[in-house]
Amino acid sequence: MSVTTTETTGTAPALPRKTLGLAMIGLAVMMTLLHYAGLLPAWLHRLPEAIIPPFATWLDAIFNFVKDDLGLLALTRLLTDGLEVVLDATANLLFGKRRWPNIGPIPWSAIAAMTAVVGYYLGGWRMALLAGGTFVWTAMIGQWDIAMQTMSVLVVAAPLAFAIGLVLGISAWKSPSFDAVLRPVLAVLQTLPFFTYLLPAVIFFKVGPTAGAVATTVYAIPPMILMTTLGLQKVSPEVVEAGKMSGCTRWQMLRHVYIPAARTEILVGVNQVIMLCLAMVVLTAFIGMPGLGAKLLAMMGSFKIGRSFEIGVTIVLLAVTLDRMSKAWVVKLPEHFERGTPFWIRHKFLLMAIGAFVGFTLIAQVVPILSEVGRKQSWSQGKEIDTLIKGFLAIDAVQAITNSIRYVLNIWVLNPLRDFMLSIPTVAFVLFISAAALLVAGRREAVLAAAFFGLVALTGWWDRSVITLYSVLAAVSIALLLGVPIGVVAARKEKTANAVLLACDTAQTFPSFIYLIPAIMLFGITATSVVMSILIFSMVPLVRYTIEGLRNVPDEMTEAADMAGATRMQKLWNVQLPLALPTMAVGFNQAIMFAFFMVIIAAFIGTQDLGQELQRTLAGTDLGKNFVLGICVTLMALTFDMVIMKWADDKKARLGLN
């Protein structure tokens, strides 16, 4: 009798994700308990300084080599001179700065009238009223000069960002290897704190409008690159084949086939460029950029809420106007005329805009208020608003409520959470983050999460990073508890949903640091005010994506639930919310990204996190430290973005959703 044996070769099967993840969490908990018992080695609690690489010193050495030895500083100074000429020209035209060509300023009424005509061409009377009304408000509220200081940089930075982004996007589309290198760079650029953009701009391009224009341009380039590449990749093969059959050269294919076919995506990129430029040009007030941002900072410093609110409204109106007009440009199809159509018919709106501009320019020479609104003629009600707010804050009931909220959050929630997170050993913290990524997303994400947080630990800024993360998680958790129920209730009725989404748009377009004022006035210089300022900003995407997720639940699913006799709550919990979860997860991810952005601005309240250290770097030339701190924020933000989006994609695939 013979016995047949079968040999198995290969490696042992890998542990299931759940088992491995729970084991990692168990190990992290055990290490934390050992630390509390005083039995954990000190080097496992915090990495010894001896093994912390001097990243900042290395970066400073590279920076000094590039700046001095390679002559980059001399080159950027030449570029600065050229950029100053352009900025001086726009400043002269828009608000009368005494520079070439010495023909400004253009009357505010001429700009308002011309913009109204452009608005009518793009979107009819409503758009015309919005566009013209925005500039009328800006002039009559007494903010024309500071608004035009901001716009004089915006009209230079936005075209620069568009041109550079378009060229790089086309290059990435043509070269997959270049695209593969560019993608991670763009991911980092989109998550870097805005302070990290400001210091290099100051060092290479001087303090003021030139540095502001450069920082604004660089900040706005990434979405233009991404949308250009996406649009060109989506051009249908049939369109390409038709161009080749027509005998087009490479340049003709790009100019007359690819770019027109990718028009929608490219114009969406233009919209994003304009909005990011407006957001950043306000924030460049921190490096001496005059305009709305600088005035808002000055008003905030003296707690003039009324004037701050009026400036915030102006920024919101400008943002909404530019957003709506650029979006209308995206959807508006090019007009085609028969051969021989007269010029004045083909370009009637252009002629109307020129006519309105010239007409009001001439009228303004006779009617002074149409050229410049004096202080006595201004509609500003800033002082009256300040009086109302002070009266509101003096009400006993308001003080009792805010004091109670501050006490409960500070004593029972925020301080214990901060102390607990700081008490966790570094290695245990990294293990826990990696385990969470493994359970939620997968092995690849777990490895990257461990690498990212491990690198944060190696920078030597671990405690500051943990405090930053604690502020983000605390604010987003409260935002989740408030934002999701608001979104669920609002999604029930179309009118309510539209009203709430309008409120979200308005809240998102307000300058981010304006939220610091009510937080400080209500809750003082405390951790509560930091969290509250982040909370308002980060709650917007949670509300928005909850509404969108519930709106996009397939009708057949809700109809099936109705036919099965489900109650409203059963339908919500068992059908609508599960199907909306992938979309809601995107909102949660956006909330965390917004929170990481806002927590840096909240450093002005007096935090002890990375934002405070980043703010200090602006006072000197410590570029290495600036980059290291910015990378710490980026690595933490990228970890959450990677894990949440992977979970959302997997959930969509399991549910069969596009």
UniProtKB/Swiss-Prot annotation:
Domain ABC transmembrane type-1 stretches: 147-326, 465-644
Entry's localization field: Cell inner membrane
Cited Pfam families: BPD_transp_1
GO molecular function, one term: carnitine transmembrane transporter activity
Transmembrane segments: 20-40, 103-123, 127-147, 153-173, 185-205, 212-232, 273-293, 300-320, 349-369, 420-440, 447-467, 469-489, 517-537, 585-605, 627-647
Source domain of life: Bacteria
SUPFAM superfamilies, per database record: MetI-like
GO biological process: choline transport; glycine betaine transport
Keywords associated with the record: Cell inner membrane, Cell membrane, Membrane, Repeat, Transmembrane, Transmembrane helix, Transport
Topological category with respect to the lipid bilayer: Multi-pass membrane protein
Induction section of the entry: Expression is induced by TMAO.
Gene Ontology cellular-component annotations: ATP-binding cassette (ABC) transporter complex
Chain's role: Part of the ABC transporter complex TmoXWV involved in trimethylamine N-oxide (TMAO) import. Responsible for the translocation of the substrate across the membrane. Is specific for TMAO and essential for TMAO metabolism.
Family: Belongs to the binding-protein-dependent transport system permease family.
Subunit structure: The complex is probably composed of two ATP-binding proteins (TmoW), two transmembrane proteins (TmoV) and a solute-binding protein (TmoX).
Protein's name in the database: Trimethylamine N-oxide transport system permease protein TmoV
Organism: Ruegeria pomeroyi (strain ATCC 700808 / DSM 15171 / DSS-3) (Silicibacter pomeroyi)
